[in-house]
Regions:
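Residue-level detector of functional hotspots within protein domains
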Residues: 2, 20, 39-41, 45, ...
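Catalytic cores of NTP-dependent nucleotidyl/adenyl transfer enzymes across multiple folds
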Residues: 11, 17-18, 32, 37-41, ...
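Active-site nucleotide-donor binding segment shared across nucleotidyl transfer reactions
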Residues: 44-75, 79-87
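Hydrophobic transmembrane alpha-helix bundles
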Residues: 66-68, 72-73, 83-99, 161-180
Length: 207
């Protein structure tokens, strides 16, 4: 995927347009799916980020399991609570104590996301994308990618929605691909990649 990400803009555009024609969708959809997948690959190829984060949510059901047909614009991630607290949020305590701990963990998570996490993600993604914390939501990092196909309904950004209080278990390793690689596998030196993901049954249960 890295090779495709670094193709000349014209070559990338042709790949996405041809893939879209085969699929009966718009090039902007194929383009955004590529960048969602590329961001996922970069995050979980980095040892530090892979230790901090876990893939979850509806996007995981479509991208990692193929259980729902859904075009995914956002990436839901669980932040390992141990990065922001020494106290186990699952330990027995009073409701008042639990509420205080949850608030403390959330506050530390906001600090961590804007500091260490963003500071790690930026060099991992490199100069191809611009990464910023969402102005109106401190749990979101927006990754702006080099869009070639303007679309009134698709922002040229991948939203990383990050929370520390979601369940971490059960999880497993799954392989993920993108639309363009499925249509033109010969263009990709690596058609798919591995991510650590909350298992589908847990995600369905939470929904």
């Amino acid at each position: 995927m890295e090779r495709v990400a670094r193709l000349a803009a014209r070559e990338r555009s042709e790949l996405f347009a041809e893939s879209a024609a085969r699929m009966g969708t718009t090039p902007a959809v194929v383009e955004k799916d590529f960048w969602v997948s590329w961001v996922l690959r970069c995050l979980f190829a980095d040892a530090q980020l892979a230790n901090w984060l876990m893939f979850k949510g509806g996007t995981s059901l479509s991208k990692a399991y193929g259980l729902i047909q859904r075009f995914s614009e956002d990436i839901d991630l669980v932040l390992d609570w141990r990065t922001v607290s020494n106290a186990d949020p699952l330990a027995k305590r009073s409701q008042t104590q639990q509420n205080k701990l949850n608030a403390d963990i959330e506050a530390e998570a906001v600090r961590f996301i804007a500091g260490e996490l963003l500071g790690r993600i930026r060099p991992v993604l490199g100069e191809l994308c611009v990464c910023e914390v969402e102005v109106n939501d401190a749990h979101v990092i927006n990754v702006r990618y080099p869009a070639a196909f303007p679309d009134a309904y698709l922002r040229p950004e991948v939203r990383l929605e990050i929370g520390p209080l979601a369940a971490w278990l059960p999880h497993e390793l799954r392989r993920v691909s993108c639309y363009a690689a499925e249509q033109f596998p010969a263009v990709f030196t690596q058609r798919d990649f591995e991510v650590r993901v909350i298992r589908a049954e847990r995600t369905f249960w939470e929904k």
